[in-house]
Amino acid sequence: MTDTPNQLPPWRGSVSLDFELAADGTTQWQGGARSPLKLLRHFTAGDGRCVMPLLHTAGGLVGGDQLEIALHAAAGSRSFLTSVAAQKIYGSRGRSRVQPQGRWAQITLQAELEAGADLEWLPQETVVFAGALLEQQQQITVAPGASWLGADVVRLGRTARGEDLGAGRFCNSLSIRRGEQWSVVERLSLEQEQLPNPHGMGGEPVLGTLIWIAPEPLENEQLAQLLKGGRADREGLSGTMAIGPLEPGLIARYRGGSSQAARLWFFRLWRRIRAVQGLSEPSWPRTWPFQEAELALNPEPATTATTAAR
């Protein structure tokens, strides 16, 4: 079984951005993008933070496509990056006797933060279609005194259409180093037959992770209040949600059936993290689903679907 020989060559999209603190207290950027990735018009938030939306003009990836994102945040800079829409990973191509499932799509993120930098990476969710193969790699280097906030939400299959992952597979590699020490090192590989495992996805199609590497260790009472508030923020949301300490910072996990629930919870956590740092409260990003903004700020009453892991 082979694909037709007249296929278009795979995409090799990339973004490279450097953020620097200007004399007027705002964060300026330099860099560029290669199609199909595109930088949309940035704006400066009230606290001088550079807000940069990224657009994937091709609408999605197929097997063999690659996206590379490289970020550098200089000392004192503040930046927030998000995506305009969900990232779609379509069924693989390039099938052959050697690669019967086809070729993999690849997304790579590399970020380097200097001391005193503050970088927030909160893209919209990734949707892995049936039969798609996605390899995602994230390598983050955080200098002591810098703050990194990153979130990742992935849906395995278009469940609203009754679709599961099928012959597809999702692999994720995440490493975060703070100074000379590793804060997070994770390797994840999921395929359809593993999803029902109660010790894994428990039959749920959506997983999400939010990690905050704080610039300095939090006081015990401060951390306890942050975690307590984060657990209260689960109110009204479906799925299993857990939050715990990370040295220094926190890590939050979502497993459930709703990417919206994961996004709303992570936004509420984002507000609390900003408050702990004494920074301005974040606004609901302009490129996110606008109809969810009210739910994010005003939680509905708790439902029986909410599961608090810890």
Curated annotation (Swiss-Prot):
Belongs to the UreD family. It comes from the Bacteria. UreD, UreF and UreG form a complex that acts as a GTP-hydrolysis-dependent molecular chaperone, activating the urease apoprotein by helping to assemble the nickel containing metallocenter of UreC. The UreE protein probably delivers the nickel. PANTHER family: UREASE ACCESSORY PROTEIN D (PTHR33643:SF1). GO terms for molecular function: nickel cation binding. GO terms for cellular component: cytoplasm. Keywords: Chaperone, Cytoplasm, Nickel insertion. This is Urease accessory protein UreD. The gene is ureD. The lineage of its organism: Bacteria, Bacillati, Cyanobacteriota, Cyanophyceae, Synechococcales.
